[in-house]
Amino acid sequence: MEPADAPATASAVQAILNADILIFGPGSLYTSVIPNLLVTGIRDAVIKSEAVKIYICNVMTQPGETDGYGAFEHVQALIQQAGTQFLDYVIVNDQRVTAAQLAQYNEKGSMPVTPDIKKIERLGIQVIPTRLISNKDLVRHNPQKLAQVIISLVYRLRLFGKGIQFFDYFFMR
């Protein structure tokens, strides 16, 4: 990053500190998501913020960037960059890709990201596994499904607070 010590704007820091929810992703882990944590003032505000912090994990690996990564490795990379575990929730895809989709992506060196639910939960993070893939040819997040999961989580948090997991398994699938 240039400059390496780029300052965060006061308005960005204040927006993070005033936020109810901070959502990271989906997107390229090292070129879209992690860069948000490279600016020290932003990273510090994210860690200090009392907002619920949600990471939306990619559904496929990116050749040359996240080869062999499951959801756990994505989360580990975020935590390593932040210097501390800061996430409350991780939304992961648990839907299988079709054989045709898998063949198409194998040619490019891309594989489905494994959900790694238990490994992530051991970090103290609640995992929301759900069927997120679009029914089109490309393996992407279905925007309507993803929006539904996020909105359901927001309503659940408003109604019950951070600690209720019941909805995760019965109503968000």
PLM feature spans:
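Binuclear metal-dependent hydrolase catalytic cores centered on His/Asp/Glu-rich metal-binding motifs
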Residues: 1-3
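Conserved phosphate- and dinucleotide-binding cores of soluble alpha/beta proteins
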Residues: 5, 9, 15-17, 29, ...
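Structural motif
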Residues: 23-25, 54-56, 91
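Generic secondary-structure boundary/loop-capping signal
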Residues: 26-30, 129
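C-terminal functional extensions of proteins
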Residues: 68-173
